[in-house]
Amino acid sequence: MRHSVIAAVLTVASTTSAALTWSLEKSSSPTTDEAEAYGLIEAALEAAVARHARLGDASKTLYVQYVPGVPTAEASYDGTIRFGTDRSYLNERTALHEISHTLGIGQTQAFDDRCAANDWPTATPLLQSWDGADAIINCGGGHIWPYGLNYNDEWSETNADRHVELINAMLADGL
């Protein structure tokens, strides 16, 4: 009996650790602008985190803020994501893109080293299975393409799924 209880606890702990979790910092008395932004940001994060849960196993605690001075959105490896006032960026595409930065895209030495060497033994074959034998992961300016979801015109359900799958493959490669 003791072993089954320990096994159950370990299963819960490992399931919990392999997930993206997030919290949105909110004003206690939000303005109309803040309330609207909070709703859009929450919807974007809920969709992005659900997609990650369905297609990958990335793990990170995300600290999300609405910061009117931010032109679009920005993120750091420490898990902070900041969205600005431009409503065209308060969407799932932007949330997925910024989450990738919190996971290491454009943020770590491992990313820089693997990009410079084009050393993605798991991610490159995955990309090639979609885009053909000549496909490579391009890196520049702290971003990747294809499937980096760098701009709103890159959005599609297929591209969003591939983004999550590619980021998870890059994590498996040591991102």
Kindly label every feature range from the protein language model:
Residues M1-A13:
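Fungal secretory targeting signals
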Residues T108-L175:
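Metalloprotease/metallohydrolase-associated module, dominated by Zn2+-dependent proteases
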Residues P68-V70, T85-R87, Q107:
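Short, flexible loop/turn elements at secondary-structure junctions
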Residues T15-A19:
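Sec/Tat signal peptide C-region and signal peptidase I cleavage site
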Residues R93-G106:
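Active-site recognition of the HExxH zinc-binding catalytic motif
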Residues L20-E74:
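Auxiliary, metal-adjacent structural segments of Zn-dependent hydrolase domains
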Residues I81-L96:
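Short pre-active-site segment immediately N-terminal to the catalytic Zn-binding motif
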